[in-house]
Each structure stands twice: as structure tokens, then as C-alpha cells.
């Protein structure tokens, strides 16, 4: 019973960390990377479809992405979707493909992206702490039902706290790395 609670908490904390990593891929650094366009949705036969399902996104050079639509007639829709995505990109349509130049990040935009990264990290920390709280309340319920002793509950609570500390430290490392990437010129 205790092991199941700890394993569930660990799994959920790992998912929070993965979610943070995924959120970080959406935050632009100065370098071109296909995952920046991961959230772009393109209208395709009446339904919004992820860009990756209607076009191939590759890195042409360190500051340029190349987008090739699987169907040539979709290029205009892909262009419009990228422009309206709120990412601040203005693709160049070359007829068969789109080129997206990554504008150099100004100090102001770097600070804004750093703030976004910190906010995402704080959300992940809160999620990890909520998972800890849920696990501790499950342990307390087991004590109330006399399924485990208070000593077992205390030991399990210490283990859950160690898990929490480990994942919060991993979140810290991830946000420091992202900040370093953002501030590198």
C-alpha cells in the first residue's frame, strides 16, 4: 500500500517534470529548432491539425527554419497559421517552401522569455508540492483506517519528502539551463 502511494507520487512528479521540459521547448531561444512551431495548428479540411502532420519542419541553419508542406496547396494555410500563432514569425514564401528567419532576441525579449521560463518552473514546483500533499493525505488516511502504524507513515512521509526535494532540484537545474540558453548571445 505504501509503496503504491510512493510509486504513484513519483510517476506523477516525473510527468510534471516532463511537462515543464515540454513547456520549455515552446520558449524560443536565439537558435532555430523545429519544436518552436510545435504548437502551431493549421486548418486542414475543416479541422485544426498540428503543423507536424501537414508539413515537414527542418533547420536550414542556426537562425532559419524551413517548412515544406506535404501538399503544395496547403502552403498558404501553413503560412497564415504561423503568422497568426503569436510567435512573432513572418515566413518567406518561396512557392514550394517557407523560410522562417529567427529574429535576434533583444534584451527585453530575453528577459520576457526568462520570466516565462521561471513561471513555468514555478507551476511545476507547485504541481510537485500538490502531489506531495496528496500522497501525505493518503498516508494519513491509512493511519486513520489502522492499515499502517504511525512509524510507517512517518518513514513513508520522509520518503515522499525526499522525492519532492529531488524533483524540485531537477526543476531548478532545468530552469537554470533554460535561463543560460536564453541569456547566451
UniProtKB/Swiss-Prot annotation:
Where does it mainly reside? cytoplasm
Family annotation (HAMAP family): RRF
Name used for this protein in its record: Ribosome-recycling factor
Gene behind the chain: frr
Kindly state which keywords UniProt assigns to this record, in alphabetical order.
Answer: Cytoplasm, Protein biosynthesis
By its UniProt entry, which Gene3D superfamilies does this protein fall under? Answer: 3.30.1360.40, Ribosome-recycling factor (1.10.132.20)
One MF annotation (Gene Ontology) recorded for this entry: ribosomal large subunit binding
- InterPro entries recorded: Ribosome_recyc_fac (IPR002661), Ribosome_recyc_fac_dom (IPR023584), RRF_sf (IPR036191)
Q: Does the keyword Transferase apply?
A: no
Q: Which species is this record about?
A: Pseudomonas savastanoi pv. phaseolicola (strain 1448A / Race 6) (Pseudomonas syringae pv. phaseolicola (strain 1448A / Race 6))
Amino acid at each position: 500500500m505504501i509503496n503504491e502511494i510512493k510509486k504513484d507520487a513519483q510517476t506523477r512528479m516525473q510527468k510534471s517534470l516532463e511537462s515543464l521540459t515540454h513547456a520549455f521547448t515552446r520558449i524560443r531561444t536565439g537558435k532555430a529548432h523545429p519544436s518552436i512551431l510545435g504548437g502551431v495548428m493549421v486548418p486542414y479540411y475543416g479541422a485544426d491539425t498540428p503543423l507536424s502532420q501537414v508539413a515537414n519542419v527542418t533547420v536550414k541553419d542556426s537562425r532559419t527554419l524551413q517548412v515544406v508542406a506535404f501538399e503544395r496547396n496547403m502552403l498558404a494555410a501553413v503560412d497564415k497559421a504561423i503568422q497568426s500563432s503569436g510567435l512573432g514569425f513572418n515566413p518567406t514564401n518561396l512557392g514550394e517552401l517557407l523560410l522562417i528567419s529567427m529574429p535576434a532576441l533583444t534584451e527585453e525579449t530575453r528577459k520576457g522569455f526568462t520570466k516565462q521560463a521561471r513561471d513555468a518552473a514555478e507551476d511545476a514546483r507547485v504541481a510537485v508540492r500538490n502531489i506531495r500533499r496528496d500522497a501525505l493525505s493518503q498516508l494519513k488516511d491509512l493511519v486513520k483506517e489502522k492499515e499502517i502504524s504511525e512509524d510507517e507513515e512517518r518513514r513513508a512521509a520522509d520518503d515522499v519528502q525526499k522525492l519532492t526535494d529531488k524533483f524540485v532540484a531537477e526543476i531548478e537545474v532545468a530552469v537554470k539551463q533554460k535561463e543560460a540558453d536564453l541569456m547566451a548571445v
